[in-house]
Amino acid sequence: MTESIVTPKENPLAVAPVGGLIRRFALPAIVSMLVNTIYNITDQIFIGHTVGILGNAATNTAFPVVILSTGLAQLVGIGTAANFNLSMGAKARDAARSYVGTGLIMSAAFGILLGCLIYMFQMPVLLLCGATENVLPYAQRYLGITACGLPFLLFFTANSMLIRADGAPSYAMRCMVSGAVLNILLDALFMLGFGWGMEGAALATVMAQIVSFLVCIRYFFRFQAFPIVRTMLRMRGREMLRIAKLGLSNFLNQIIMMTVGITLNNILTHYGAASVYGADIPLAVAGIVTKLNSVLIAFTVGLAQGCQPIFSFNMGAGNYGRIKETYRKGLVFALLLSMAIFLVFQLFPRQITAIFGGGSELYFDFAEKYLRIYLMMVCISGVQPLTVNYFTAIGSVRTGLMLSLSRQGLFLLPLLILLPHIFGLDGALYAGPIAEVLAFILAMSTMYRHWQQLTRMERGK
């Protein structure tokens, strides 16, 4: 069993080699993030092969709901995990207990509320997300079922972060993997075997999410830092605010990402309708590229989340040199991961698109063009999430929030609105790489200034 967090001297976060710690915590976090994307990618692949382009477009219009769920999970999960680690690093065990109990109840309450709201208002939600007349019936059949799984999705996504913070990254990975494997098996059974189409994909997703939820719940009966007792499980106003404070930057980033997705869908259908591709092909391709980009996000954000306990604990313990070493090595890993994925996207765009089903030559032409242009600068995209998570983990909420919102809100969203008016459909594609470069410059310049401050703190210790 992994050693529980007790004191800085005893805890491996304070004394173990940094490179090994990053690998130990980041690998399960990356796998967990990847598995979370598999819920959506698996459906997209099976739907593409059994339903076709309209089915792929339908999952794209439902995807902003998943982004919203992820945002709420990160608001609670990252905020709870960061406060838990900061409290344990400062030897404040009672405060850590309060954060854990509050975080568990918050994640359950938010999930139930979101699921009910989406189920009741699914038609206006889908129209807002860009569903065309052809796509809407498929999207309704899909979202009407997957809305019922949102409470389970939000709970296990949020609390897998707390499980990692408790020193059990492998178990957090198990929560995600168990559901993902079942999702793949049920997709094959329900769609290929029974021919249930969109409903089969949605049902497979919900059943898999329930399994991941049950595996996650099981862990809290043997929480390592301290026992979870019933009196801990209540919402406390002060703890809720502090959890929200440290999770806010990640949450708002997801909200902006959702807004960008909705804006992009509507721009693609509007300008696509006036092009040779029509409205439905760009909408379907955007769904595929969004899912592929989520693979990159899984690697980079998973790496950043894996570094978070090291950042938080050592800031609480005052180990500034160790914090700098963690960021340096995390940056190298982030750039290597981003470059590897960039090469795959640039070299094999058509082959990757074919994984998600067949289509006309126009469909594949647009998919190849979209992949190569929109994801042109993903080779540097790992820097921003690492830097955002760093500032969030050490409690610098304003800086983390500013950086978190920069790529999507400050740069990408305005570019998506402006460039298509000048360059048409191509303008929406080039907005992606331009925003990536601007966000990279902002993150590195901000970290450079903070690095000098860390050096002074290290020398004055």
Which residues are covered by each model-predicted region?
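Hydrophobic transmembrane alpha-helices of multi-pass small-molecule transporters
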Residues: 68-71, 183-187, 213-217, 295, ...
